[in-house]
Amino acid sequence: EPVFLDFKKDMSQLTAKSDIPVLYKQNVANDLFQLIYVFDMGNNNDKALGTAFDYLEYLGTSDMTPEELKSEFYRLACTFYVSPGNERTYVVLSGLNENMPAAMQLFEKLLADAQVNKEAYENLVEDILKARTDAKLNQGKNFSRLMNYAMYGPQSPATNVLTEAELISMNPQELVDRIHNQNNYKHRILYYGPSSSKDLLATIDQYHQVPAVLKDIPAGNEY
C-alpha cells in the first residue's frame, strides 16, 4: 500500500542561499534524483506564464540550439519540464544523480539565457488556436466550461487566458523575459535523491541562479 510523505516528519528542512527553503529526503533505493523548484504563483498571477513555459520547450540559448540542448540533456540522462498551474508552478529536473550538477548548470543556463525563436512562436500560437477550436467541438470540454461558469461566474481560471488577438500581437520577447525572471521570485526547493544534504546545498548554492534577495510573488486574481 502506498506510503505518503509527511513533509515535516519525513523530510529534512534546510536553507540554501538567498534564504531559499529546501525540503530534503535521501533516496537510498537507486541513483536517481528529482529536484523541484516550487513557486506559489501561476496563471492566476500572470495569464501569460503557461504560454511562456510552453514556449521554453522550443528555445535554445545564445550558444546552443534547441537540438543541442536536448542532445546534451539526453547524454546526461536527465530531463526537465515546467508545469504552471493556476496557483502554483513546478520547475522539475530529474535523472541520474551523478550528473545532477552538470544538468542543473545546463538547465539554469537555459532559464537565464533562452533566446527568442520567432518561427517557433508562430507555430506555438497556431497550435494553441487549433486546440481551442478543437475544444469547442469536444462535448466533455464544453461541459467542463459550463461547470466552471456555474462555479465561478463569467470570470474564472478557464477564461483567464491570452486571447487570440493577444497571442498574435505579442512580442515573443515578452514571454522569454518571463522565463528569465522566474527564478527572481520567492520559491522553495524539494529534493529526493542520493546526495547528502551537504552536497545538495553545495550544488544548489553553486548553480542556482538567483538574486541575493528574492522578489515577492505578485498578487493574483482570486476566483
Where are these regions (language model features)?
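Conserved short beta-strand edge segments in small beta-sheet-based binding/regulatory domains
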Residues: 116-123, 214-217
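An aromatic/glycine/proline-enriched structural segment found at the starts
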Residues: 160, 185-223
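M16 family metallopeptidases and their MPP-like homologs
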Residues: 29-57, 61-113, 124-133, 138-169, ...
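Short, surface-exposed charged micro-motifs
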Residues: 13, 23, 79-81
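His/Glu-based metal-binding/catalytic segments typifying zinc-dependent metallopeptidases
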Residues: 1-4, 17-48, 186, 212-223
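Extended non-catalytic domains of envelope/secretory-pathway proteins
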Residues: 3-17, 168-170
